[in-house]
Amino acid sequence: MTTEDLLYVRKELLTGFQVMKKDHRTQVKGRKSSTVNNYMMLMAEIFQFGTDNGYAKENPFSGINRLKKAKGEPDPLTTDEFIRFIQACGHQQMRNLWSLAVYTGMRHGELCGLAWEDIDLHAGTIIVKRNLTQTDEFTLPKTDAGTDRVIYLIQPAIDALRNQAQLTRLGRQFEVEVKLREYGQSVIQPCTFVFSPQCVKRGPRTGYHYAVNSINKIWAPIIKRAGIRYRNAYQSRHTYACWSLSAGANPNFIATQMGHTDAQMVYKVYGKWMSEKSAEQVSLLNQALSRYAPSLPQSMVAAQ
């Protein structure tokens, strides 16, 4: 196989029709750049294994770069849209879940894995100990900075958790295996899940915690019922960041809350929401630093 062959495969993955399930009648054409990059990366690893172990002389992937991805701008809910969204939630648990998502910026996998054992309502904190992956495995949170991070809750988030406590605080406790970053290593953690599908629909096939995909599927119908413009469910996280920065919160604090290593990601993704506070920052600096300015003779001031 040559590099030219692989470039053709990549083009087909990017622009060709997808193989759909039997009950899916509408054909879908094309894939996202990120999806194609993932497929190509898996194939590249197979070829690299073959090269390293003498099955092939060279890896044809060596001359192929990753497809560039368009950077999506944050598209947060407005305060009015959020109110309508919460009002459109059909169950109290959904109102609590999405309120906590927006008022903490937690990743959806972290919300799925959130347990009452992680929460101290008296201190107003959450310790993020685990994340649920797309393949329904519990792992540590996405980044080292996000692991065991302390989220300091604002009052609306505390209120949502107090409401949710009436539904699930006395629920069943599970022993959950959480995979660590080192291969083959895991720990067992006791978990009384905060958000349980059993509250909404009881049955033998209903689980005791949500899957990440089901969280995303819950979002779309609520958006539709609320009559607001559609955006993906990840915007709940962007909404927290944009609202907080627009209110003048410290970017370093927001980065810590969201599990970023430092504030660089916050500046990169949400920079324009910070610029709205430029006038206030100048006023603050004037008040704080003017007293350090040396006094000038009146004639010099007039001349300037």
Predicted segments with their positions:
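N-terminal core-binding DNA-recognition domain of tyrosine recombinases/integrases
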Residues: M1-E73, R84-A88, G227
